[in-house]
């Protein structure tokens, strides 16, 4: 707990660079202290830390991934405690990065240290890769992996990044959605003017609203040409797994004060995990301050994230989006791509699923298996570039508030997360 508190207290905001190098140094120091061979690779924008321990050819080799960078702190007035002053309240540690992803990172190191202290050796060979740019689309990491495949040679990849479901059960995930993130900048005039001219001059705000309604209609259909062409539907085995999952909808809706929007003809989990999405992450135009101002807006900005499922090609969709906007007559729109992450998937019949399931059951009890999960992580780096089966176990709090004010991690989950990694290593060694 003290070690986690120490690295949470060290800012490591990848988007601004704040404290990232110092956090890297702190983690390297901790890794060396438990006996790992450690090498730092100064790739742009932030360093990758590679750790190794064990080289027994008769043992399996597990590559453990985590990231040490965090999201910006956001609105400080919304935090109950300072984000980089980790505070424990009633068994819960509050602070930026507690759950995403410094808690799991430290749990992995704790598990390695446990095996070495208790038994003098690990049941498997371990390689670790900790990056400092996950929250910035893992920039620079694909190129690093392509040129260091031998260094990272392993049998499988294991990591923990994410939360339990809303029934407080850990989630074992074998795949993730990809993401295409774009910014649409629509300009109608050189500057804002008095709204008295609304009858005769164009409004950027209204044009943006109209454009967005053409890209995705009220029934949820995305109208970018070819958007759904390459979608791989869930297999019958995957559908059977989804059908067995518990109903978490009531707890989910209650937690967020929301109501369901998914179509009645699709199951909740297939809609959540197996369907691509088109989301407005942010939209801005004109006057949004206190009080009133009568403004005819000259510029409108919308930030869009599209979550992609297996076989969808972000580059292809980006090209189609640009062409479609032009075809609709919006020559005044600039499309800025802020990043593309490929979807990734490990088949549910991988032999590594059973030992991970057994370990999770022994440590946490009831759990869920997701053939694919709804969020995005750089799993394609391991499945597509390194060609390795990849399994993730999400065990942080269901309401851990990742990316939001008051991010937190229940210490009992942190302790169990440590125990889980230690047990996963044991179960894999006995395959």
Predicted regions and their residues:
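Flexible glycine/proline-rich, aromatic-decorated loop/lid segments
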Residues: 171-187, 391-395
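Acidic/histidine-rich catalytic neighborhood of metal-dependent amide-processing enzymes
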Residues: 101-175
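A short core secondary-structure module
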Residues: 143, 198-220
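Active-site metal-coordination/substrate-binding segment of hydrolases
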Residues: 59-130, 150, 416
């Amino acid at each position: 707990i003290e070690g986690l508190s120490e690295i949470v207290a060290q800012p490591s905001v990848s988007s601004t660079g704040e404290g990232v190098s110092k956090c890297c140094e702190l983690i390297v120091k901790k890794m060396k202290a438990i006996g790992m061979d450690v090498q730092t690779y100064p790739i742009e924008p932030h360093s990758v830390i590679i750790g190794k321990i064990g080289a027994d050819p008769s043992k399996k080799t597990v590559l453990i991934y985590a990231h040490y960078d965090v999201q910006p702190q956001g609105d400080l007035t919304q935090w109950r405690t300072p984000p980089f002053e980790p505070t424990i309240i009633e068994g819960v540690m509050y602070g930026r990065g507690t759950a995403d992803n410094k808690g799991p990172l430290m749990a992995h190191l704790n598990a390695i240290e446990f095996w070495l202290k208790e038994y003098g050796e690990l049941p498997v060979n371990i390689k670790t890769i900790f990056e400092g740019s996950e929250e910035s689309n893992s920039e620079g990491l694909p190129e690093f992996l392509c040129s260091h495949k031998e260094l990272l040679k392993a049998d499988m990849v294991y990591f923990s990044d994410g939360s339990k479901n809303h029934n407080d059960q850990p989630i074992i995930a074998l795949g993730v959605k990809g993401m295409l993130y774009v910014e649409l900048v629509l300009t109608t005039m050189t500057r804002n003017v008095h709204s008295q001219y609304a009858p005769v001059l164009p409004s950027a705000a209204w044009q943006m609203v109209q454009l967005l309604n053409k890209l995705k209609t009220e029934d949820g259909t995305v109208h970018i040409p070819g958007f759904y062409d390459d979608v791989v539907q869930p297999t019958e085995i995957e559908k059977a797994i989804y059908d067995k999952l518990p109903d978490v909808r009531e707890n989910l809706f209650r937690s967020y004060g929301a109501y369901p929007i998914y179509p009645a003809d699709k199951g909740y989990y297939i809609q959540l995990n197996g369907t691509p999405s088109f989301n407005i992450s942010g939209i801005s135009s004109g006057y949004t301050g206190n009080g009133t101002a009568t403004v005819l807006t000259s510029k409108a900005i919308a930030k869009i994230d599209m979550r992609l499922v297996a076989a969808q090609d972000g580059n292809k969709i980006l090209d189609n989006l640009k062409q479609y906007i032009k075809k609709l007559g919006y020559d005044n729109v600039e499309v800025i791509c802020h990043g593309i992450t490929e979807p990734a998937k490990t088949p549910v019949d991988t032999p590594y699923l059973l030992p991970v399931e057994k370990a999770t059951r022994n440590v946490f009890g009831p759990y869920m298996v997701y053939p694919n999960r709804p969020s995005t992580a750089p799993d394609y780096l391991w499945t597509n570039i390194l060609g390795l089966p990849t399994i993730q176990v999400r065990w942080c709090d269901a309401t851990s508030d990742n990316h939001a004010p008051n991010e937190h991690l229940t210490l009992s989950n942190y302790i169990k997360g440590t125990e889980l990694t230690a047990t996963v290593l044991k179960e894999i060694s006995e395959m």
